[in-house]
A protein has these predicted regions:
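Short, Lys/Arg-enriched N-terminal segment that forms or immediately precedes the first helix
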Residues: 1-15
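Amphipathic alpha-helical dimerization/coiled-coil segments
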Residues: 3, 89-114
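N-terminal helix-turn-helix DNA-binding core of bacterial DNA-binding proteins
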Residues: 14-56, 69
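Basic amphipathic alpha-helical segments that dock to polyanions
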Residues: 57-59, 63-64
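Beta-hairpin "wing" of winged helix-turn-helix
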Residues: 65-76, 82
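Basic, amphipathic "hinge/linker" alpha-helix immediately C-terminal to the N-terminal HTH DNA-binding motif
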Residues: 76-95
Length: 114
């Protein structure tokens, strides 16, 4: 089993609280396509190694919507979330920030990301 799959299977390490990255990950996922809540939860679980609690995910989505970064609409019995133009701009700013703040670390440990 690769280093990546071992880490993903266990979730985030105890030393690192990954909750602060939730909004960033949601924006990034919605930049790929519009999604409903359970679909977002599944995609987050693939990347973080654990499915987010609905009590964490849906308040984060509501906050992103309140800030104008995400828009929701009802389709049949599901709520679909879509990235707004403001959300696209916010994601670009966040990517710039993360690259500047963490890029050197990722380059140094790139073998863990492969």
């Amino acid at each position: 089993m690769s280093k990546r799959s071992v880490a993903a299977a266990r979730g985030p390490p105890e030393c690192c609280d990954m909750r602060g990255l939730l909004s960033f990950l949601i924006l990034w996922l919605l930049s790929k396509k519009d999604m409903y809540g359970q679909e977002i939860a599944k995609e987050l679980a693939k990347r973080k190694g654990e499915k987010p609690n609905p009590g964490t995910l849906y308040p984060a989505l509501r906050d992103l919507e309140r800030r104008g970064l995400v828009r929701s609409s009802r389709h049949e019995r599901k709520t679909i979330y879509k990235l707004t133009e403001e959300g696209k701009k916010g994601l670009k700013k966040a990517c710039y920030y993360f690259c500047r703040a963490y890029g050197e670390i990722f380059r140094e440990y790139r073998d863990f990301c492969a």
